[in-house]
Design a protein with these regions (language model features):
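Short pre-active-site segment immediately N-terminal to redox-active cysteine/selenocysteine motifs
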Residues: 43-46, 50-54, 123
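Structural microenvironment flanking redox-active thiols in thiol-disulfide oxidoreductases
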Residues: 60-100, 114-115
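Sec-dependent N-terminal signal peptides
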Residues: 4-13
Length: 160
């Protein structure tokens, strides 16, 4: 009986990590709508990183990744979708923040936090890695200096 329960729990845990992206409609900074279940990177892994303009750890993480992003792209082809959860009254702060930091990510807006809530995410930064088949293979909440190295290692492992 214990073995059956353990097997069920392990199967459930694996299925949570290998889930597909939910269908939520977000907007680009130019106002175009995009459904999250259509996000892709031409069969290569991609990262979804939830942030807010007021979140200092989020900004530190995205700055740290920005320093190595071009190298990551050349090596692995990885793409990053940075998803702002700033509420409607703060959305106008996103574009200047992105511009001031020189982030080259595809920026998406989730002012109601619906996309983040779909993952039961409450704390940001909240980061997902999605494999080339569109399956979520990694989830992480929070940021400590140097944690971006773990992200690229996980992406590299997907390409082996």
């Amino acid at each position: 009986m214990k073995k059956a329960i353990l097997t069920f729990i392990m199967t459930f845990a694996v299925s949570l990590c290998e889930a597909q992206l939910p269908a939520v409609t977000l907007k680009t900074m130019n106002g175009a709508e995009i459904r999250t279940d259509t996000l892709s990177n031409g069969g290569k892994p991609f990262i979804i990183d939830f942030f807010a303009t007021w979140c200092k750890p989020c900004n530190r993480e995205l700055d740290a990744i920005s320093e190595v992003y071009e190298e990551w792209q050349e090596e692995t082809g990885v793409k990053i979708f940075a998803v702002s959860i700033d509420q409607a009254q703060n959305i106008n702060k996103v574009k200047p923040l992105v511009s001031n930091h020189g982030w080259e990510y595809e920026i998406l807006l989730d002012p109601n936090g619906e996309f983040l809530r779909a993952f039961s995410g409450h704390a940001i930064p909240y980061t997902l890695i999605v494999d080339g088949k569109g399956e979520i293979v990694y989830k992480h909440s929070g940021y400590t200096d140097g944690a971006e190295a773990e992200l690229i290692e996980k992406v590299r492992a997907l390409l082996k």
